[in-house]
Amino acid sequence: MSRRQPFALLGLLLLVSMAAGWAAAPPPAAHVDVFYFHRTARCPTCLDMEAYTAEAAGHFSAEREAGRIHFRAVNLDDENDRHYEQDYALEFSAVVLSRRVNSQEAAWTNLPDAWAFVGDKSNFLAYVETEISKQLEQLPKRRP
């Protein structure tokens, strides 16, 4: 073994450990979860509310593609999802926005006026989109 080989090996190990550190520390994940919570049995109004909520979330295509917004319909009758009733103090179908940073919930808000607007699709969409925008504005700014 030449005198240079131990230093080359040490340098290689240092580079590998630095690269592993970079790979292990991804940029902070920040996004808004748009939830529509429902039961198994649903009326036409509940089905409309889910469709309108999904449509409102879909209007944020750039944010969705960037992973900054997610839509999920959740059946509260499913055993694995029952905890949401307690988490968000739910009594019936609801639209809830959850702002998440680094895999932790930073804040959430129930949109109680969704029920008042569900009979008027354009007002429902405007209401939900405005509330989603407010949550997106609160996310940490992306690094350039």
Where are these regions (language model features)?
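Charged, often glycine-rich, active-site loop that binds/positions anionic groups
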Residues: R82-E91
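Thiol-based oxidoreductase modules, predominantly thioredoxin-like and allied folds used
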Residues: E65-N80
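Non-catalytic, surface beta->alpha helical segment in thiol-disulfide oxidoreductase systems
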Residues: L97-K141
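Bacterial Sec-dependent signal peptides at the C-terminal "C-region" and cleavage site
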Residues: M18-P28
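Local sequence-structure signature of Cys/Sec-based thiol-disulfide redox active-site neighborhoods
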Residues: P28-H59
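Bacterial N-terminal signal peptides that target proteins for export
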Residues: M1-G11
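Bacterial N-terminal signal peptides
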Residues: L9-A19
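Signal peptide-proximal N-terminal region
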Residues: A57-G67
